[in-house]
Curated annotation (Swiss-Prot):
GO terms for molecular function: ferric-chelate reductase activity. The lineage of its organism: Eukaryota, Fungi, Dikarya, Ascomycota, Saccharomycotina. It is an enzyme of class 1 (oxidoreductase). Interacts with ribosomes. InterPro entries: FAD-bd_8 (IPR013112), Fe3_Rdtase_TM_dom (IPR013130), Fe_red_NAD-bd_6 (IPR013121), FNR_nucleotide-bd (IPR039261), RBOH/FRE (IPR050369). One of its GO terms (biological process) is reductive iron assimilation. It is a multi-pass membrane protein. The chain crosses the membrane at residues 21-41, 70-90, 101-118, 142-162, 177-197, 204-224, 230-250. This is Probable metalloreductase AIM14. GO terms for cellular component: plasma membrane. Its EC number is 1.16.1.-.
């Protein structure tokens, strides 16, 4: 009898080949749980510092509600990494964990893309996209580093293994070569994202950031084994498509109606846009994003747009912007510098721009409805955020105390805003009150309450560098420490005593030059009033350079006061 030949079947893959599939699904589930938890936190959480709780507990609660990257990323990665090391030996089956790093980086991308949607309908009621900018920056960096480590560790593993040809593994195998290309792109992105590089040429960083992200999303499924096409590639492509649709559907063309500028005195300018570009209602302190290119222009997609806070209220007849246009020139030659400086962006009446969309401020709804004791502190072009808030609360009958403090470098900035108020007929004459006032400080003497002499304006304002050169201005050199007599402009003819410069607003606006500025002194009445009202009725807003925000935030933490801020700086 003839014996049948023995057929030996050889496994195509080792027993660990599919070891990471379930882990990828686990990461996706954790991402979903995090989103649900985030929505619940913002809907029912408390950002108000309790007067009965310790300062440490209040700080943790505030950082948790404020989506502090250290807190939120710590929680997220603690959950993600719990089952990372499981079942397989790290010494004999290290390949499992090297592959797991790659799958982890790709499985986290859907969460990152989802949190940067604008608008984000799932979180729209209690969050704005600006809330996620610090989180997005650090989350993106971690995802990038994890993916890069995946590639580096494999190269090291093959290089030290005498039984493996590095060239054969890395170059001649198509799947691995694609991964090698991804690693090079990711490394280039990390180099461009280093602070000095990013600030030196933000446009380059932004272009590289977008192109590498798209390449990472599309090339990884070619490289990955086993595949990640479903559900990860499908989710990532869907979210990318939504990002693109948002930039098409909500965009509209606009023309500048008027521009009031005097570059020989100040870079602060007033720009007027048509009222029809925005919906009938928008919240005070909202901002818009403008691109100098049309939607059919590739540069519309490759280069960053520019955000501008709206200085108007919804009931106004036009949309007004009060902005600072970046310049490196000396006074008298500013306009030439603005036109030649590649880092600057300025709005011209003769050009057509694209309004990408309008976005609400990061201000809780209860602040608008319940706030009765309000203080607003701003520096430079931060007046564009502060002024509509002041007008909103000024018109409310139930507001018991309202004060706005504006810190500027020269009197010309005040003149421009005063002209804006006159042009729009905003005299605040209807409801005069001793408890409602605007104080303008012009580079006067400053008595430090905290060690702000150690705070420089070179602090990297990370919120403003995501997807834009942010609020184009030069307020970063408006440090609180500049409010002393040595820094006063010798050409400034502002009197040294307090005065009310206009008849229309004589009982409301006071200008102070060469005066010492201490926040506690300026807010004595505000602080006294806070002890007489419910905690959710007292709010302090701050907008300006980092040193001003730090001072305001510390004051609120010490006094257990609700704090809302918007950062202007580069």
């Amino acid at each position: 009898m003839k014996e049948s030949p023995l057929i030996t079947l050889v496994k195509r893959h080792s027993e660990t080949h599919f070891a990471n599939i379930k882990y990828g699904y686990y990461v996706l589930i954790i991402s979903l749980v995090y989103l649900i938890g985030l929505a619940l936190l913002r809907a029912f959480g408390r950002r108000t510092p309790s007067r009965s709780s310790s300062a440490f507990k209040n700080k943790i609660i505030y950082r948790l509600y404020d989506i502090d990257p250290a807190i939120h990323l710590g929680i997220l990665f603690f959950a993600v990494l719990i089952p990372f090391y499981y079942h397989y030996s790290l010494t004999t089956q290290s390949t499992v964990y090297l592959k797991r790093l790659g799958r982890l980086s790709y499985a986290l991308i859907p969460l990152n893309l989802f949190l940067t949607l604008r608008p984000n309908w799932f979180l729209r009621k209690n969050c704005t996209y600006t809330d996620f900018i610090p989180f997005h920056k650090w989350f993106s960096r971690i995802i990038t580093v994890i993916g890069l480590l995946h590639g580096i560790f494999f190269i090291i593993k093959w290089a030290i293994d005498d039984n493996v040809s590095l060239k054969q593994k890395l170059i001649l195998k198509t799947f691995n070569f694609v991964g090698f290309i991804i690693s090079i792109l990711v490394l280039f992105l990390l180099i461009c994202s280093i602070g000095p590089m990013r600030r030196y040429n933000y446009r380059l960083f932004y272009i590289v950031h977008n192109l590498v992200n798209v390449a990472f999303i599309l090339l990884t499924p070619i490289h990955s084994r086993p595949g990640v096409k479903f559900p990860f590639l499908l989710l990532n492509c869907t979210l990318l498509f939504i990002h693109i649709i948002n930039r098409i559907v909500f965009a509209k063309s606009l023309m500048i109606l008027n521009k009031n500028a005097n570059y020989s005195k100040t870079n602060l300018v007033h720009v007027r846009l048509p009222r029809a570009i925005l919906p009938d209602y928008f919240e005070p302190g909202s901002h818009i994003r403008i691109s100098p290119y049309r939607r059919i222009n590739p540069l519309y997609w490759l280069l960053p747009s520019h955000p501008y806070t709206i200085a108007s209220l919804a009931e106004d007849n036009s949309i007004d912007l009060i902005i600072k246009e970046t310049s490196t020139a000396e006074p008298g030659s500013q306009i030439e510098s603005l036109r030649s400086n590649p880092k600057s962006f300025h709005l011209d009446q003769e050009k057509t721009y694209t309004l990408i969309n309008s976005y609400p401020p990061s201000v809780p709804e209860e602040c608008y409805s319940q706030g009765t004791n309000i203080a607003i502190i701003c520096g430079g072009s931060g007046i564009s955020f502060a002024l509509p808030l002041f007008r909103h609360f000024f018109n409310k009958e139930n507001v018991k105390y309202l004060k706005m403090i504006w810190l500027i470098k020269n009197y010309s900035e005040y003149e421009l805003v005063l002209d804006y108020l006159k042009t729009n007929g905003l005299t605040f004459e209807k409801k005069p009150s001793n408890n409602k006032r605007i104080s303008v400080f012009i580079s006067g003497e400053y008595t430090a309450e905290t060690r702000l002499d150690e705070i420089t304006t070179n602090i990297d304002d990370e919120n403003s560098e995501y997807e834009m050169g942010s609020f184009n201005n030069e307020d970063e050199d408006l440090s609180i420490s500049n409010f002393n007599s040595e820094n006063a402009d010798s050409n400034d003819k502002t009197p040294e005593t307090s005065h009310s410069p206009t008849k229309e607003n004589g009982s409301l606006i006071e200008v102070k030059s060469k005066h010492s500025f201490t926040l506690s002194n300026e807010l004595k009445s505000f602080n006294n009033e806070s002890a007489q009202v419910n905690q959710n009725e007292t709010w302090l807003f701050s907008c300006g350079p980092p040193s001003l925000l730090q001072l305001s935030k510390k004051y609120c933490n010490d006094e257990r006061i609700n704090f809302v801020c918007e950062t202007y700086g580069l």
